[in-house]
Amino acid sequence: MPPKGWRKDSEGNYPNTSYIKEQEKISIDDLLFPKSIITSLAKESLQNAFQKGEEERRITVSKDAALAMQRSATVFVNHLLMFARMNAKDSNRKSCNDQDIMAALDTLGLGALESILTGKMQEYQEAILWKKQNKVNNAVPGADGDIAMEDDEDDEDDDGREGADADAEPKSRADTEVQQGNAENDKLDGPPVNQEQVPSTRQNDLDLSTKKQKTE
C-alpha cells in the first residue's frame, strides 16, 4: 500500500516513483549557470571590443545586467542543446558532438557563429595539449637538461682522476727505485737503504777520503 497522502490518478492507479519525479516542477533558477563565470565572460568580451592603444577601462556590471545575462545564457544554451539532441537522435546516438552543435546553429539561423565557435574550440584543444605536454615534461626526470649536467659532472670527475694519476706516477717511480735499492742491500746483508739517508752516506764517503789524504 502506498504511503498516506498519495492520491489516485484519473485512471484510478497510484502514481509510481518515476511519475512523481516527472511531475516535479523545475524552474529556470535550478538550471542557471554560475553568475561569476557569466560576468567574467561579459567583461572579457567588452575588453576585447576596445581598440588597441586605448587605455584599459574598469568595467562594472550591475546586478540586474548580470542576472539578465545569466538567464538569457541559460535559455539559449538549453534551446541550442535541444536541437543538438534531436540531431543526435536522428543519427541513432545518445550523446551530442560538435557536429550536432554546428547543425543546431544552422537550424536556428545562427550559422555565422560557426567560425567563431570553431576558433574557440581550437584554442581550447591547444591549451589542453599544452598542459598535457607540460605534465609529461615535469614527470620525466632529466627532461629539462639534467642529463647534460650529469654528463658534464662525469667529465670533470674523469679529468680530476687523470690529473691525480699523473701526479702519482713520479711518486710511484721513486718508491720503486727505493724498494729496489733496499732489496739489493738485503742481499748483501746490509741495512735497508732509505731515500732520506742517501745524502748522509755520500757525506761519510767524502769524510773518509779526506782522512786518507791527510794520513798520506
Swiss-Prot record:
Residues 161-176, 204-216 have a biased composition (Basic and acidic residues). This is DNA polymerase epsilon subunit D. It is found in: Nucleus. GO terms for molecular function: chromatin DNA binding; protein heterodimerization activity. InterPro entries: DNA_Pol-Epsilon_Subunit, Histone-fold. Heterotetramer. Consists of four subunits: POL2, DPB2, DPB3 and DPB4. It comes from the Eukaryota. The keyword Nucleus applies. In eukaryotes there are five DNA polymerases: alpha, beta, gamma, delta, and epsilon which are responsible for different reactions of DNA synthesis.
